[in-house]
Amino acid sequence: MTVPLEAEGLIGKHYRQLDHFQVGREKIREFAIAVKDDHPTHYNETAAFEAGYPALVAPLTFLAIAGRRVQLEIFTKFNIPINVARVFHRDQKFRFYRTILAQDKLYFDTYLDSVIESHGTVIAEVRSEVTDTEGKAVVTSIVTMLGELARQDATAEETVAAIASI
């Protein structure tokens, strides 16, 4: 396994997403339905309050919504040689410092921790340190993505744009 030529010098690079991600009540509910998480704190503010929270509680994997956008941005900004139209998550880890709640504004500081290539496959590890408006840690997300080495593909840019718009 080797570091792709295009990725040399990128390891350890930092990217701060320009805007925050606003956690919305309805997005929490929609996501909880999608992942079939029926815990009442995701749907009912009274249930969340009774459980000790001031707002709806996001499911543990809710961060994936904002994380996907950040990952696409970092692959584009750093020109990582991976075909993002044909990539999947190999692994994802979260370290929570507090619960994500409705109305949170989340800020992402993202780092490219590693990129390796072997036999036409690229493995990239991306870490995001997520903070709130006060700069306090909310969660650390570490995602390992696996995909084919980027090649010129006539439809790749259209596919990436479609994925980014979701």
UniProtKB/Swiss-Prot annotation:
Residues 10-131 form the MaoC-like domain. Gene3D superfamilies: Hotdog Thioesterase (3.10.129.10). InterPro entries: FAS1-like_DH_region, HadA-like, HotDog_dom_sf. Pfam families: FAS1_DH_region. CDD domains: R_hydratase_like. Belongs to the UPF0336 family. This is UPF0336 protein ML2425. It comes from Mycobacterium leprae (strain TN).
